[in-house]
C-alpha cells in the first residue's frame, strides 16, 4: 500500500478545505511546488494533485502551476479536479500526469473511459473518483446526490475499463475524526481493480486498518498539513519498517 500526499490547488495556492467547501479553508500555503517537494523529501512516491478551481468553477487558473509541479518533481503525479472531457484528460496526460482522475464526467457517462481507451490511453492511467455521502455516490463537487451506491457505480466503471478507483467518504473528509472502514471494505471486496482510499485518514492506526483490508493506496491531506500525522513515519509504518 502506498501513502500519497494530497496537494490541493486553489488560486495557485495549496489549500485544504473542510468537507470540500470552498468557503471553509483550514490551510493555505503560497507555493504548491514547495509543498510537493517537502512531501517527496519525506519519502512520498507519488503526489496527488487536485485542481479545485477547475473542479468548482471550470477555470484553468492553475494549469501552469500543475505543469510546473509535474515537470519539476521526480515522482509520478496523479491529477484530478474538473476533468470533464476526453480532451481534458488527454491534455493532462500530455502534461505528464501519471494518472488522470475522472469524477462526475465518468459517473454520469462511463463511456468516457471507453473513448480514452480507444485513443490508446492505458487503463492504468485512468482513475475514477467515487465520492460517497450517506452511502450514495455524490457528484459535482459533492453538491449533487445520486441514487446509486459506490459498489453499483464501481462495477460499471470497472467493466468499462477504469484502472483504479479513488474512493472518498465525504462524511468524514477533512474532519480529522478518523475513517469509516466499512464502506471502503465493501468496495475492496466487490471490485477487482485497485482502490485508493481518501477522506478522514487521521491516525497511523487508520492506515494499518486500510492496509489490512487490501486497499492499494491512501491519500492523506489534512492530517499531514495539521501535523497530526508525520508523513515520513506514516510511510515507514505502512512498509512495516
From Swiss-Prot:
Give the enzyme class: isomerase
Q: What reaction does this catalyse?
A: 1-(5-phospho-beta-D-ribosyl)-5-[(5-phospho-beta-D-ribosylamino)methylideneamino]imidazole-4-carboxamide = 5-[(5-phospho-1-deoxy-D-ribulos-1-ylimino)methylamino]-1-(5-phospho-beta-D-ribosyl)imidazole-4-carboxamide
Cell compartments where the protein resides: Cytoplasm
* Pathway, per record: Amino-acid biosynthesis; L-histidine biosynthesis; L-histidine from 5-phospho-alpha-D-ribose 1-diphosphate: step 4/9
A GO MF label: 1-(5-phosphoribosyl)-5-[(5-phosphoribosylamino)methylideneamino]imidazole-4-carboxamide isomerase activity
Which EC number applies? Answer: 5.3.1.16
Give the residues annotated as active site. Answer: 8, 131
Q: Could you list this entry's UniProt keywords, alphabetically sorted.
A: Amino-acid biosynthesis, Cytoplasm, Histidine biosynthesis, Isomerase
* PANTHER family hit by this protein: 1-(5-PHOSPHORIBOSYL)-5-[(5-PHOSPHORIBOSYLAMINO)METHYLIDENEAMINO] IMIDAZOLE-4-CARBOXAMIDE ISOMERASE
This protein is called what? 1-(5-phosphoribosyl)-5-[(5-phosphoribosylamino)methylideneamino] imidazole-4-carboxamide isomerase
Q: Name one GO biological process term.
A: L-tryptophan biosynthetic process
Amino acid at each position: 500500500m502506498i501513502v500519497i500526499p494530497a496537494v490541493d490547488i486553489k488560486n495557485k495556492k495549496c489549500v485544504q478545505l473542510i468537507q470540500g467547501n470552498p468557503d471553509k479553508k483550514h490551510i493555505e500555503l503560497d507555493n504548491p511546488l514547495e509543498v510537493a517537494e517537502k512531501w517527496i523529501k519525506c519519502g512520498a512516491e507519488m503526489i496527488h494533485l487536485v485542481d479545485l478551481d477547475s473542479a468548482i468553477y471550470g477555470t484553468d487558473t492553475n494549469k501552469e502551476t500543475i505543469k510546473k509541479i509535474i515537470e519539476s518533481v521526480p515522482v509520478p503525479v496523479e491529477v484530478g479536479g474538473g476533468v470533464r472531457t476526453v480532451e481534458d484528460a488527454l491534455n493532462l496526460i500530455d502534461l505528464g500526469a501519471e494518472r488522470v482522475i475522472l469524477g462526475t464526467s465518468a459517473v454520469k457517462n462511463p463511456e468516457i473511459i471507453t473513448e480514452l481507451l480507444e485513443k490508446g490511453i492505458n487503463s492504468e492511467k485512468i482513475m475514477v473518483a467515487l465520492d460517497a455521502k450517506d452511502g450514495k455516490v455524490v457528484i459535482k463537487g459533492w453538491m449533487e446526490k445520486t441514487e446509486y451506491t459506490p459498489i453499483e457505480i464501481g462495477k460499471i466503471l470497472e467493466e468499462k475499463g477504469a484502472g483504479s478507483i479513488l474512493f472518498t467518504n465525504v462524511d468524514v473528509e477533512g474532519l480529522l475524526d478518523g475513517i469509516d472502514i466499512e464502506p471502503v471494505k465493501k468496495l475492496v471486496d466487490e471490485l477487482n481493480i485497485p482502490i485508493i482510499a481518501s477522506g478522514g485518514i487521521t491516525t497511523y492506526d487508520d492506515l494499518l486498518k486500510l492496509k489490512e483490508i487490501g486497499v492499494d493506496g491512501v491519500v492523506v491531506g489534512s492530517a499531514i498539513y495539521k501535523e497530526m500525522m508525520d508523513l515520513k513515519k506514516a510511510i515507514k509504518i505502512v512498509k512495516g519498517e
